[in-house]
Amino acid sequence: MKVHKESTGLLVSMATLFTGICLSLFYFLGASIVSYLVMIIAIFLYLLTINFFRCPKRHSPFANDDRAVVAPADGKIVAIEEVSENEILHERCIQVSIFMSIFNVHANWFPCEGKVTHVSHKNGHFIAAYLPKSSTDNERSAIVIKTEKGARILARQIAGALARRIVTYAEVGDICSVDAHMGFIKFGSRVDVYLPLGSQVEVKMDQKTVGNQTLIARLPE
């Protein structure tokens, strides 16, 4: 399993900082309990960060299925409801939300096959991502995908209390695949998917999801 490219700068900075601290402690304090304790803590934090930025290579069993909508992220289903999406789509939709804890893979996949027709970013707050109001109040990025049959799917990356940086790779005009990454969110967050009414939801509340693998819905025929 490789480490995500978004980790490069942070891991280099952490390695430099931790190495400097440990060398200084061993120089001034020698091989003391404090020196070894700090070194162990530094190694633990570094390995924890590597684990957070892990980036598994996956191939979806639903690639090329024009009705399939897959989970864009690892996590847990925290909302399934009919809502009015008034910010971008301006229509009634089915919202399926996935909460990502700091222990989940934080790469985000495209939820369906199609063409990107809209990408935007909006500043906001950083309240806990598992709360419903995070969908409308938090900093977020939005990606709209139009399928071959004309359905519009909105995927919204939402920052959380710890996740204060959203990275979006999608650009308007991109032809997207469920096997491709649409972005990355650092340190705990949420992804909302807005589906056309009439879509058949295939997940339940509190169900665990695997990005790119779990079928969350089938679009209307």
Curated annotation (Swiss-Prot):
Active-site residues per Swiss-Prot or TrEMBL entry: S189
Domain of life: Bacteria
Record's function text: Catalyzes the formation of phosphatidylethanolamine (PtdEtn) from phosphatidylserine (PtdSer).
Keywords per UniProt: Cell membrane, Decarboxylase, Lipid biosynthesis, Lipid metabolism, Lyase, Membrane, Phospholipid biosynthesis, Phospholipid metabolism, Pyruvate, Zymogen
InterPro entries named among the record's database cross-references: PS_Dcarbxylase (IPR003817), PSD-A (IPR033175)
HAMAP family noted in UniProt: PS_decarb_PSD_A
An individual GO BP term: phosphatidylethanolamine biosynthetic process
Co-factor binding details: Binds 1 pyruvoyl group covalently per subunit.
Major place of residence: membrane
GO cellular component: plasma membrane
This protein's pathway: Phospholipid metabolism; phosphatidylethanolamine biosynthesis; phosphatidylethanolamine from CDP-diacylglycerol: step 2/2
Protein name as annotated: Phosphatidylserine decarboxylase proenzyme
Stored PANTHER family: ARCHAETIDYLSERINE DECARBOXYLASE PROENZYME-RELATED
Membrane association type: Peripheral membrane protein
Names of required cofactors: pyruvate
